[in-house]
Amino acid sequence: MSEALERFIDQGIGRKPADIVLKGGRFFDLVTGELVASDIAISGDRIVGTCGDYEGREEIDVSGRIVVPGFIDTHLHIESSLVTPHEFDRCVLPLGITTAICDPHEIANVLGTEGIQFFLDSAMETIMDIRVQLSSCVPATHLETAGADLPIERLTPFRHHPKVIGLAEFMNFPGVIHKDPICLAKLDAFQGGHIDGHAPLLRGKELNGYLATGIRTDHECTSAEEALEKIRKGMHILVREGSVSKDLQALMPIITERLSPHLALCTDDRNPLDIAEQGHLDHMIRTAIAAGVEPLAIYRAASISAARAFGLSDRGLVAPGWRADLVVLDSLENCKAEMVFSGGRRVTDALFARRKPVEPVGLDSVKAREVKAADFGVPYSEVETSVIGVLPGKIITEHRRYRLPAVGNQTGPDLGRDIIKVAVIERHGVNGNHANGFVQGFGLKKGAIASTVGHDSHNICVVGVSEEDMALAANRLGAIKGGFVVVEDGRVTGEIALPIAGLMSLEPYERVRDILHHLRQAAFALGATLEEPFLQLAFLPLPVIPHLKISDRGLVDVDKFALIG
């Protein structure tokens, strides 16, 4: 290391040419808010010189451009991009996302520690810096059937891995508040490290109790009022804009220069089609500035404030001694990355090609029994039926009640009120559970949509008008080893295979993007009105997000944390 330090000193002072010098541009100083005209000297993975002129062995002209620190996605599930970590790296790093803090609890719920190890192995090979948080709630609750169980004894061996950053989102906030021994054991083991939160709508003294355990960050705020209370109580708020959960607009009032030290950005769940059409964190930055947010506030949240929230003290500024994660932009407002450096390496196709591949895992994870149309029947009742109310752009659902029509001795859908059937089928080969219910808000007039992506236990979830089409869609998932399927009038009109744990494709992200475009069109042909019907479907079984959900064990009243049917 002493040789490296000597090199850093000599190149920083200018005694020797730097490895790389960016010349002729300006950099955005996130401390003062100034645009500073200066060369930027890089030695190895580190910035060694600013605010002066430098010579370099390689000099790159960035005249007319603005250089900012690399962007940090502070909470995401790479599995929701439907591609491997290697393909995610290739997809978003060119957009300026140089660090991603991921929670692999999707694959962990299916494969357990094998899934976590797959992510850690991948993170050691990617060009972007992928950091892994250890999945805290596998299974998420006792109200569903997962493919794995991760008690604290299975997590602690990973704690000191160089890519591990802490304990991932603690979703079981009722378990924390009610002092569940399993929850407390995990929290106790990670005292002094980073513990990520997940506390939708938690307020008042219950929030105090939750935070008293050492939890410091939260990405579930859906209103400025909720976010402000959590900031007052010492939390960093991770402003989220994913493919389904879109909270940026609601939280813009808190994205100010004064509050920016307590903010960061995240996507949580974002698929390659949305990344291709809109972008990633760069899309959030553009959107916020166009809506009137000060550039200094949003760029701080995208980098230095994010780094500080997670203890990544080596990155987030364009300054000597800091990690050379840099994005060369056309302008602050457009936030279009023209050049990206990750750890001092210029991001190119050739750089990606040098990565070592990681063998896929979980290629035979869909073990569901074959179902028939009759399995989707719901006996008729004259009393009101609980219906899951979908809110576009939200993973929070409403608990609605309706009198539904009789079809013989069965309860039928009510297309006039946009109410169709929903079912969850256990697919890990544990118990063969099957639960049926009703959902409002998808817009379907015919057919069915099915998925093995079903947060967080990732059982098969299917919505539809026709029970025959629902059965065909669910069974087709077994044949393709997991994925998404669209069925119309007895035939499959769209599908994507996700054979890695039933969650991720083996294909390049460009191919996944193109298939997703076709899938959306197939879903829209059924009448689907949701912008992202597949990921919206995937959140119907998530029993840690209010208010009504469905698991393989039945309908879940999340407010009561209990099965109700």
Curated annotation (Swiss-Prot):
GO BP term, pick one: adenine catabolic process
Gene3D superfamilies linked to this entry: Metal-dependent hydrolases (3.20.20.140), Urease, subunit C, domain 1 (2.30.40.10)
Cofactor list: Mn(2+)
EC number: 3.5.4.2
Substrates-to-products reaction catalysed: adenine + H2O + H(+) = hypoxanthine + NH4(+)
Keywords: Hydrolase, Manganese
A GO term for molecular function: adenine deaminase activity
InterPro entries: Adenine_deam, Adenine_deam_C, Amidohydro-rel, Metal-dep_hydrolase_composite, Metal_Hydrolase
Top-level EC class as recorded in UniProt: hydrolase
PANTHER family associated with the record: ADENINE DEAMINASE, N-ACETYLGLUCOSAMINE-6-PHOSPHATE DEACETYLASE
Family, as annotated: Belongs to the metallo-dependent hydrolases superfamily. Adenine deaminase family.
Protein name per Swiss-Prot or TrEMBL: Adenine deaminase
